[in-house]
């Protein structure tokens, strides 16, 4: 645990396994009120955290609460019953100390095991300007009843950049935003969400929830977008364009709203202003069967400006 007043701490090259609870805890649950309480400039790098939560099942691999300038990079986190990496600890739009945190280059897999609900490979909470979730490989996220998501931006998550990630084989979706504002989701690969692929649970009238651009979404019969308990896409509260969508079944469902029961055709979706420059086409992965999501040079996504930011698609 890296607690109150800690600065300049680095945890590197450790193996943490067979854990009753979580792996590494950074920061506190409360917003610091004095200089000596602040937790900042921490690095958690190149560690292996596995087989956790054996007593307290809801434990997290790396938990970052009210802390800033924290780097969680190049770790492998696996075989937990709950979230892999959690960042921020303010519910909704209230005061938050968490900002400028980087979650990059981690391999997070075999999370949830179908035991608990409402989790993510990477989970964020609250307003976090400057925070980025970048170039992570996340796969095999499985929830009990609901909420097995790859990247999960929970209540109030705002001003966060999610880019260059490869997320696949989740029970409920590669990306989920509960509610938040002005998040940027770009240059990611989201593949093979069982129930849905991209989920927004609660939109807000007159607020841009997220900008979704230059992503590749591969489905196998589930809708590309899903609206949750209080999201109506007719509110026009997201910006989505220059994406590539493909369904292995040949029957693409662009969007389904749980609140209204409505399904949108591509033409109806575009009539709302969404995805007018996006295309429905095979993204040309190296091998979906082998879960190698490396793009061939002839991929249509590259023509739309998709950026291969990282070593996309390989487990490493």
At which residue positions do the language-model features occur?
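Short glycine/acidic-rich loop motifs that flank beta-strands on beta-rich extracellular proteins
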Residues: 1, 20-26, 53-60, 81-87, ...
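Surface-exposed loop/turn motifs in large extracellular/passenger domains
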Residues: 2-12, 29-46, 63-73, 90-102, ...
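Extended polysaccharide-engagement surfaces of secreted carbohydrate-active enzymes
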Residues: 139, 168, 183
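Active/binding-pocket-proximal capping segment
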Residues: 180-183, 188-193, 205, 262
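Acidic, glycine- and Ser/Thr-rich low-complexity intrinsically disordered tracts
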Residues: 205-316
